[in-house]
């Protein structure tokens, strides 16, 4: 049986390779700078991007720079000894023990206290990072076990760090007020600006109530809301559940911290 002969046109069509359909380029993620900006203006973009990369070095670096500058300005404008003396107003028992010392010992204690206050203040970023690790651990375990969330510890820590960015705005406000010449009589690093009811209270009158009132802070509530939104974005847990978990842990930490502060004040 004679074989079929292909025409030149048919041969060219048979030999021509099939044109490949171009694949769309993968969408690039947010830069670290864009993440920081979007945390304030479009937080869902930032937290959704954490599923791609859980890097949190940029907001931590911002915190280190701002807090270090704040501590330096406060040390120059107010002085660490004065700051330590103001802090002792919230510790009536410690204040009474200091006043019972002989004058030379009291002076020595105040000098040493000022130096210790400076060291602790400059170590604030390290202390904060440890606190973030504790908070991230508590939230990660709760979302994983209680809510069945599909979230890693690394992403949980990144959410906590990015959500804390509004607290840096509070630090900036405090730094500006100190630089502008705020009265040093009642300044403290723990509650430097009037963003909570505790700022208007006398700590020694009721240490527990003062601590609780200080925790009800505008910037802290903003941070808590961002944390809840973050876990909703990365884990698909219902927003109401996320808010209940985040604010529940905040209430626990606040009450326990206030109770310990009152017990050892």
Regions found by a protein language model. Give the residues of each.
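Low-complexity, intrinsically disordered extramembrane tails and loops of integral membrane proteins
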Residues: 1-30
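Short, membrane-interfacial amphipathic segments enriched in basic
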Residues: 23-41, 112
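Short alpha-helical transmembrane interface motifs in multi-pass membrane proteins
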Residues: 29, 120-125, 209-214
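Selected alpha-helical membrane-embedding segments in polytopic membrane proteins
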Residues: 32, 45-169
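Hydrophobic, aromatic-rich membrane-embedded alpha-helical segments
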Residues: 35-42, 46, 217-220
């Amino acid at each position: 049986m004679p074989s079929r002969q292909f025409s030149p046109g048919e041969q060219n069509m048979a030999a021509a390779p099939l044109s490949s359909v171009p694949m769309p380029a993968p969408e690039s993620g947010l830069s670290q700078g864009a993440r920081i900006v979007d945390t304030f203006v479009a937080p869902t973009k930032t937290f959704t991007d954490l599923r791609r990369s859980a890097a949190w070095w940029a907001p931590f670096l911002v915190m280190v720079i701002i807090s270090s500058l704040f501590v330096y300005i406060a040390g120059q404008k107010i002085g660490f000894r004065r700051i330590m003396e103001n802090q002792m107003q919230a510790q009536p028992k410690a204040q009474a023990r200091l006043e019972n010392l002989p004058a030379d010992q009291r002076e020595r204690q105040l000098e040493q206290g000022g130096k210790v206050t400076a060291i602790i203040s400059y170590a604030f970023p390290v202390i904060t990072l440890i606190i973030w690790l504790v908070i991230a651990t508590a939230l990660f375990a709760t979302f994983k076990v209680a809510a069945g969330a599909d979230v890693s510890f690394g992403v949980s820590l990144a959410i906590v760090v990015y959500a804390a960015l509004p607290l840096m705005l509070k630090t900036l406000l405090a730094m500006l007020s100190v630089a502008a010449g705020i009265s040093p009589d009642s300044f403290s690093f723990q509650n430097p600006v009037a963003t909570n009811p505790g700022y208007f209270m006398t700590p020694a009158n009721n240490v527990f109530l003062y601590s609780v009132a200080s925790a009800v802070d505008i910037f802290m509530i903003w941070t808590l809301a961002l944390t809840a939104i973050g876990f909703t974005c990365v884990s698909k847990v219902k927003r109401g559940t996320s808010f209940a978990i985040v604010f529940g842990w905040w209430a626990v930490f606040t009450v326990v911290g206030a109770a310990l502060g009152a017990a050892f004040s």
